Each structure stands twice: as C-alpha cells, then as structure tokens.
A protein has these predicted regions:
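Cofactor-binding active-site loop characterized by glycine-rich and histidine/acidic residues
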Residues: 19-26, 30-160, 178-184, 188, ...
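Thiamine diphosphate
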Residues: 104-285, 358-440, 448-450, ...
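Internal gly/pro-rich beta-alpha loop/helix module
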Residues: 449-497, 506-522
C-alpha cells in the first residue's frame, strides 16, 4: 500500500530536482551560466529512493559528476546549489567547484570517473575505525565500471568488511556510448567474485528503489559489510547541454516511463499543484538571490600553499628535532622507524597502510618493522593497488584520520597520479577551504641499487608545482624521523621522499647546532656566525639549519671558517646529500670553499634561503638525481637568476641524470646517475668562468 505522506515527500523531492535542473538549462540558454552541467533528469527516483533510506545525521555520500539529484535529496539546499552553478560566493563551495565538485557536511563529489570510489572505501574505513555507526554510500554510473580502481576498491571493501554501499545507476550510456559497446557480461554480477552481496531493480518507480535501498542499507549496517545495488534507469536529458545523439524514438519510449510522471499521476491535482508552486517559488528566489550575490575572491591561501591558517599547521617551537640533540648515532632508516612508532603512540587517529608492511617482513626497506606487532589494528597491509592505497587514504583524511600510506617504490606513484593530483590536492581548495586532507605518502625514490629502469627513478618531479600538494625530501643532514613527524602534523597532503641509498647512512651531526625559529622573507633570510656548528668527529665541516616560510628545515653545510666566504654554492635535496658531504671534504682538500644548501620542502619552493645561499658565492650549481631538463633545478635556477642575478659571477650551472632509462647493470647505472666526480667537475668548471 502506498504511503500518502511518503508519496508527497518523494514527489516534492523529485520535482525539486527536475525543475532545478531544467532551470539550469534555461540559465545556460540566457548566457548566465558557463562551463558544463550534467543533469539527472529521468534518474530522480534513484537519488530520492536511496537517500531516504539513509540516516542523514551520520551517513556519508560520495557522488560523481552527475550529482545534483543526490545533493538536493540529501542536503535540500537548492539555494546553495543554484548559487554554486552561477559562480557566486553563496554557493556551497563559493562557485569554485561548479556542477561536478560539491561538498556540504557529509556529502562529497568529484568529477573524475571512478576516482571517488577508493575515497569512499577510505571513508568507510574511517567510520568503522571511529565506531560511528555510519555507513558510506558511493554513487557510480555504468560507464565508470570500466575503471580498474573500482574493482580494486571492491576487493578492499570486501577484504576488510567495510560498511559501504555501492549504488550503480545504470542509465545505459557513458556520455554517448551505449553500455553494450563498453561492457561484457552482467554489471550486476561484477561484485560477486569479491564476495559482495548484490541486488538489482528497475528504477522507474521510486517506491521500488526505496524498498531495495532500505534492504541494502539495513544489510550494510547490520553486517558491517559492503553491498552492491544496481538501479536500471535512463537519462532523459543530454549528457551535458546539447550533445545528445540518441534517436527520437528511443527518447520517446523512455519518456513514457518517466518515474516523476508516474508518481505525479497518483497525487490529487490540487496537492500536486501546491507542491509545484512552492518549488517554483523557491527556485525563482534562489536564482534571484544568487544573481545579486558577489563572486568569490581568490584569496592568497588558494594561490600559495601555507598562507591560510586553517590549512597549515603552526610552525613548531623547534621545527626539526635537532641532530645535535641525538643521544647516539642513528641511521636514517632507524630514525624513520622510531618516528612511526612515536606517531602511532601519540595519535590514535594515525593509521599506516601499504604493501607488505606487516611483521615479520616489515616493508620492502624495513621502515615499518615492528609496527604491526605493537599496533595491529592500525597497520594494514594492502593488495597491490597503489591508486586505491592513496585513494583510501584521501577518504580517511577527509573523515578525520591521519593516514600514512607507503608506496613500495616511488616509481609506482605514477599508478596513483589521479588520486594525488585530482583528489588529494584538489579537495581543500576545490571545496573552498571547508576540508583538510592531512595525508602523507611515504615512498623511496632514486637509483644506485641496480634495480633497473622501473624501480630506480626520482618521480617526485612529476608532482612538482601541483597546487596544494607538498613534496618534502629528507637528506641525512636532517633528522629524517623528526621531519616525518612534522609532515604528519601538516594539514595538507605531502609526498615524503626517502632516498633508498640513505637508509643505512648515519645522520650527520652538528655540535650545539640550533634551529632558527623565524619564518624569514627573502631580504631577511640569513645566518649569523653563531648559527654554525662543527660536525662531530670532523675537523672540516660545519653545519647550520634554517627554516623556510612553510616551517620546514633547510640544512646548510660548509667547509670554511667564519671569516671566509664560499667560492661556490651547491643547491640540492634529498639523496644528493650522500654526495655533497664527501664533496665538501674533497673540495676543502683542493682549497675550494663550498657552501651546500639542502631544503626539505622542495615544492612549493621558498626561494629565500636558496637565493641567500647563492648570493654568498655568486657561483651556483643546482644538482638533482632526475634528468635536469624540465626539472626542479630549472625552477631553482630561474628563481636565483630573477632574485639574485646581479650578484652572480656566472650563469647557474645544473647537473642531473642522463636523459635515458636507468640501467640495472652497475657500470651503466653509474654512467647515467650523477656522481661525486661529476659534481666536482662542475664545480671546477664554474670556478673557471
């Protein structure tokens, strides 16, 4: 028997979705909207039927590019949605996200097909970890079922028994391509090999959808396991605004099955007219208000990472646990390992996940050894699924956890590029500062161990300059473990680069060395005599440490005294420190005074300490392990020339790997990668200019 109150409610919600989206088409026609719009006209029963089966006070939704219906059914914020698509400040995310990128409370969308699915898996893991009782729903379309990350996500959701409801809206088309030209077999059976229960139903009747959703939601909540619900529906409007290639006969056939018209037919005319009038008035007022609203300003925090207080951690009193305070020599590897233990001890929201990280193996490079024994519930080994490892971590971070994801080899970050670039780095600014993504991706980079072309690269270069993403690299002239603790405290996503050849090296120590606590700008960034300290056990090297304006340490090392100036400055980062430390000693023997500058936050880049270091000598070499062309060194050289060009005696020199694959054979690898001898030759060449 039909419930009259539900009939009225469902009709009002479906009509609100329909008329709002039709209004968007009208606004486009008037030239008041730009870009694109993806409507769900004809699919309203899916959104309304599923959302009304949820607990809006706690359940979480991840949706896709076609999310207006889900948003209105869940958030009931037509005013915020209209303003968003009109690009106004009062939009749900200030006009930044537009039609595809919406967020309010527990509702998230993104426009990349399939990308939201591992985010939803991570959110489900977070809710399970917090014991909130919430379930997570992820809406996806039939076209998205071609994405591999969807199946990675299903596997993990089933493996870890997560409270996640997959809702597949099968509208038969992926933009313009029909399902029969894209998928073999049954979509409804795709979840079964993972042991995920599934059901399917026609979605031309909202009560049928509602009943199916109620059963699915009850199962997920009761069993704490995923469920796969397939809703067979049809999109009656174009993919976007006017790109419909379907035949008139086909459209007419499905208009005759319109779920909204079917529901409207059972309501009394007067009741339906009253609902329609109220909806029209609400939409008209929303449009009128939005058109008089201002456009959001692009503030400094969106243009430059670290300038917005709510998205950046406070600079600690001692930004790096100073090496001079270490009680005994410690290796780069042990420093990282100890810090991971400390992080999990002190932060109950911190979780570590990655491939082969459990004891007794403890990870490919043994950084996680001992962690799973002490923290069995917060250290999770994963399948081989880099995109989902990072994607899950994004979802966990959005829901209040502090995930630390390990990618076994840095070369494999390419498999997670979409999650890093289009999800982790996008959400905070795309959602107008309403969320943070405190995610750390630890990964070993670099060559020198004979692992060959696909396990030896320095692919952090691929992510340099990505807005709202930090790349931090520790050398053995820094306390790597303390730096790891600092990036975990950061509220923005960080790729933490660990060089493989540094793991066994002892951290280089300076006696009495102290940190500078200011965040100084270009013309003020300098070090005084009192900041330098000799390296223990070495009569040549001295070290100092500064802090860039993002709060991250910058190590400096020199081979000359207080009353001298350097002949040359070498700027590098990360694993290059293993070459620079002995190079300083070699240059001292040749009576060449050298200053080495190694920042840790290599992107975004604070040029001030690098410019200061360059100006000390007027001759600068920038070195990196990846090929020099289009690399980090190019940006450093540009900044140095622009800001200190009048103090240079020669153009900035650059050194990087040869522009080819990194061979496995040791003699060939040595020919390709930068070496101490290559650095020395470049220094001598600079001094001859």
């Amino acid at each position: 028997m039909i419930n009259n109150s539900l009939t009225e409610l469902f009709y009002a919600q479906m009509q609100l979705i329909r008329r709002t989206e039709q209004t968007f088409f009208a606004l486009y026609g008037r030239g008041l909207m730009a870009g694109t719009v993806h409507t769900s006209i004809g699919q309203e029963a899916c959104a309304v039927g599923v959302v009304n089966a949820l607990d809006r006070t706690r359940d979480v939704i991840f949706s896709n590019h076609r999310a207006h219906g889900h948003f209105l059914a869940y958030c009931d914020d037509v005013e915020g949605l209209v303003a968003e698509l009109l690009g106004r400040r009062s939009g749900v995310v200030g006009g930044i996200g537009g039609t595809q990128h919406l967020h309010k409370d527990n509702f998230y969308t993104n426009g990349v097909q399939g990308g939201i699915v591992p985010n939803a898996v991570g959110a489900a893991l977070a809710e399970k970890h917090k014991q909130s009782g919430a379930i997570v729903v992820v809406f996806l379309g039939d076209g998205t079922m071609g994405q591999g990350v969807v199946y990675e996500s299903m596997n993990v959701a089933a493996l870890w028994s997560l409270p996640l409801l997959f809702v597949l809206e099968d509208n038969q088309y992926a933009q313009s391509t029909h399902r029969c030209d894209e998928h073999a077999g049954s979509l409804a059976q795709r979840a079964q090999p993972f042991g995920i229960e599934s059901a399917e139903t026609e979605a031309d009747d909202v009560f049928t959808v509602y009943a199916a959703a109620q059963r699915a939601v009850a199962y997920v909540r009761r069993q704490n396991r995923p469920f796969f619900l397939v809703l067979h529906t049809y999109r009656l409007a174009p993919h976007s605004k006017g790109d419909d290639t379907r035949s008139a006969e086909e459209l007419q056939r499905y208009w005759a099955r319109d779920p909204l018209a079917r529901l409207a037919a059972v309501l009394p005319d007067a009741q339906r007219a009253a609902i329609d009038a109220a909806i029209e008035q609400r939409i008209e007022k929303a449009v009128e208000k939005a058109l008089t609203d201002e456009v959001e300003e692009i503030g400094d925090w969106r243009l430059e990472i670290g300038a917005h207080q709510s998205l950046h951690p406070p600079i600690p009193q001692s930004p790096n646990l100073l090496i001079s305070n270490l009680q005994s020599p410690i290796s780069y590897l042990e420093s990282l390992r100890q810090s991971l233990h400390t992080i999990l001890e002190e932060d109950s929201t911190a979780l570590v996940l990655g491939e082969d990280i459990l004891d007794p193996y403890g990870g490919a490079f043994k950084v996680t050894k001992g962690l799973s024994t002490r923290f069995p519930d917060r250290v999770r080994t994963t399948p081989i699924c880099e995109a989902t490892i990072v994607g899950m971590s994004v979802g966990m971070a959005l829901r209040g956890l502090h995930p630390i994801a390990e990618i076994m080899f840095g070369d494999f970050v390419a498999l997670a590029a979409d999650q890093i670039v289009n999800h982790a780095a996008k959400y905070p600014a795309m959602y107008n500062g309403q969320v943070a993504v405190p995610l750390v991706i630890r990964t070993p980079m670099g060559g020198g161990r004979g692992y060959g072309p696909t396990h030896s690269q320095s692919l952090e270069r691929l992510f340099l300059g990505i807005p709202h993403l930090k790349i931090v690299a520790a050398s053995h002239l820094h306390d790597a473990g303390a730096l790891l603790r600092q990036v975990v405290a950061d509220r923005e996503p960080v790729i933490f680069v660990e060089h493989k050849l540094l793991y066994p090296l002892a951290l280089v120590r300076g006696e009495g060395r102290r940190a500078r606590r200011e965040t100084e700008r270009l013309r003020d960034w300098r070090l005084g005599v009192e900041d330098w300290a000799p390296v223990r056990g070495d009569g040549v090297l001295q070290m100092a440490e500064g802090v860039d304006r993002f709060g991250y340490p910058v190590a400096l090392a020199r081979n000359y005294g207080d009353d001298e100036t350097p002949d040359v400055t070498v700027i590098a980062y990360g694993g290059m420190s293993r070459l620079l430390a002995p190079l300083l000693i070699e240059m001292a023997a040749e009576e060449i005074r050298m200053l080495a500058c190694l920042p840790t936050c290599i992107s975004p880049l604070d040029a001030a300490p690098l410019v200061w270091a360059a100006a000390q000598s007027g001759r600068v070499l920038v070195a990196e392990e990846s090929p020099a062309a289009f690399g980090w060194g190019a940006e450093v050289a540009t900044q140095v020339h622009a800001l200190a060009g009048d103090r240079l005696y020669a153009p900035v020199a650059r050194l990087g790997a040869a522009p080819t694959v990194i061979p496995a054979a040791k003699p060939l690898e040595d020919m390709v990668l930068p070496s101490q001898a290559m650095l020395a030759a470049q220094v001598v060449k600079l001094l001859e200019m």
